[in-house]
Amino acid sequence: MMDYKKLGLKVGIEIHQQLDTKHKLFCLCPTLTREVEESNFEFFRYLRLKRSEIGEEDRAAKEEVERSRRFIYKYYDTTCLVEADEEPPREVNREALLIAIQVAKMLNMEVVDEVHVMRKIVIDGSNTTGFQRTALVAFGGFLEVDGKRVGVATLCLEEEACRKVEDGEGYAVYSLDRLGIPLVEIGTEPDIDSPEMAKKVAARLGMILRSTGKVKRGLGTIRQDVNISIRDGARVEIKGVQELDILDKIVEYEVLRQVNLLKIREELKQRGARVEEKVFDVTDVFSNTKSKIIRNKTVKAILLRGFGGIVGREIQPGRRLGTEFADIAKTYGLGGVFHTDELPAYGISEEEVSRLRDAVGAEDGDAVVMAAGDAVRVERALRRIIERAKHCLVGVPEETRKANEDGTTSYLRPLPGAARMYPETDVPPVVVTEEMLNVEIPELIEERARRYEKLLPKDLAWEIADSPYYRVFEEYSEKLQPTVVARVLYLAPAALRREGVEIERLEERHYRLVLDMVLRGDIAKEGAEEALKLLCQNPEMSAGQLKEKIGAAEDIDGFIAKLIEEKADLIAERGEGAFKPLMGLVMKEFRGKVDGKVVAEKLKKALKSALSQ
């Protein structure tokens, strides 16, 4: 295990949380997500780089321009000309601003006197404008985790970016449904000193945000960006961590990557390694190749003196230095790169590798990296890889990386600089009034859970306290047993999810409908799960329809139990083969009253239980 204190680990977290407001941040469109198939129109753009007010160019944006990609946008009947950047933005959404101020006060922050909107250059296609609108709302706060105080540097109110739905060679497709949804960005100071603490801080920030009851939930509604550095390493920003469970693993693997890159630097220095500036056209070497991957494509290569055996070296689980180079190539629309540490392979023969080495003048101990595809893209990608290879002689480059599902990371772009920010002239500033500052501070989920522990088991108390339907629980717990209400709101949906039922179709009105039916005695508490299942299948069912269906289902349970008992000899003789004749008897009684699939499911379950005894 690594000694993080000795390594000088510093971690800062940025939480991006979508707010559950009626309208988007700068227009009156609803904050709904849509299916791409529902799009009724599309348009495309090419984005160009704008210099800052003092004439500087942001390095991350500059690299994106070199990729010269076409961006296609999916439009809906719930989006407008503001998202398309064909109309100026409206004023800042006051509802979103009040939520941001509320969160700031919960984090002991100083709220600014006047909120000014800025433009942050982003030309990766995720914003039609070529920039993201962001506004500083508060600064200088803190939160406590395990007795340690972690500083909260800033809280910004931002517009959410577009959702990427496709990435191809030379183009990307984005959906406009998400663009403009209000979100808060909370950035901590780099006070976190271990992977475990990073996870705990992120969990606490998430809990504080959910305590407002005004944030969206579900995959993609909250993202963690993590800034990580070690002594002699560099600050690296890892974007898009959606699963809290792997956050500690991401920190651990990034530290490992930086440690390994520093080891590579020392070894390259000892070898006297250097990077040749020339990009060689080696298409002729592969003119008769059997490799389908590079056949009939322009093939170019670069020479890395003294890098032999190092390009193929693992720096994170399942990822090598060559993978870092391949990540760069992919950002230019290529499939990746090949290098001599892994060749011959991919249909490339040993003889072709030998001719490749001769063509670029490689000696023993050297490595050759090559790419195939469109000539211009290959040239640009290899030029960028030359710069990355040079940095191996220096150490760890500052860059923005993407979180992978296994906790490793991939290259995205250089770390952006200060040149990416400039004022937004279309949106007037907002003066923060005393009335706005007097916003109510809500009860924290952890405090609510402690109250519920008097009514429910500890684990269940936390789940209900953290549920978006906790107010429904409080209301109905005055009329029904709290455990019965908890069963309807949490235990039954959890069981249905395990069965593969789409419980996402359930809304608050459905839970209220079922609870009201239990309260009136229309259905037994045991029938609540079946009622919710039926509502998932048909969300518009009425109480009367549910009562009829569940009544029949309860009748069938009794009938099947009695039938299993009466036909014990048949079951003993034929085992699972008894299903067909038993099914016939049940359907004779219930045909037209209960769905055949439901009958089969219940009978199979009862038969399996009888055979296991």
From Swiss-Prot:
Top EC class of this enzyme: ligase
GO biological process: glutaminyl-tRNAGln biosynthesis via transamidation; translation
Pfam families: GAD (PF02938), GatB_N (PF02934), GatB_Yqey (PF02637)
Ligase in keyword set: yes
Keywords: ATP-binding, Ligase, Nucleotide-binding, Protein biosynthesis
Catalytic reactions on record: L-glutamyl-tRNA(Gln) + L-glutamine + ATP + H2O = L-glutaminyl-tRNA(Gln) + L-glutamate + ADP + phosphate + H(+)
SUPFAM superfamilies membership: GAD domain-like, GatB/YqeY motif, Glutamine synthetase/guanido kinase
The keyword Ribonucleoprotein appears for this protein: no
Enzyme Commission code: 6.3.5.-
GO molecular function annotation: aminoacyl-tRNA ligase activity; ATP binding; glutaminyl-tRNA synthase (glutamine-hydrolyzing) activity
GO CC aspect terms: cytoplasm
Subunit structure: Heterodimer of GatD and GatE.
Function: Allows the formation of correctly charged Gln-tRNA(Gln) through the transamidation of misacylated Glu-tRNA(Gln) in organisms which lack glutaminyl-tRNA synthetase. The reaction takes place in the presence of glutamine and ATP through an activated gamma-phospho-Glu-tRNA(Gln). The GatDE system is specific for glutamate and does not act on aspartate.
Family: Belongs to the GatB/GatE family. GatE subfamily.
Name by which UniProt lists this protein: Glutamyl-tRNA(Gln) amidotransferase subunit E
Gene name of this polypeptide: gatE
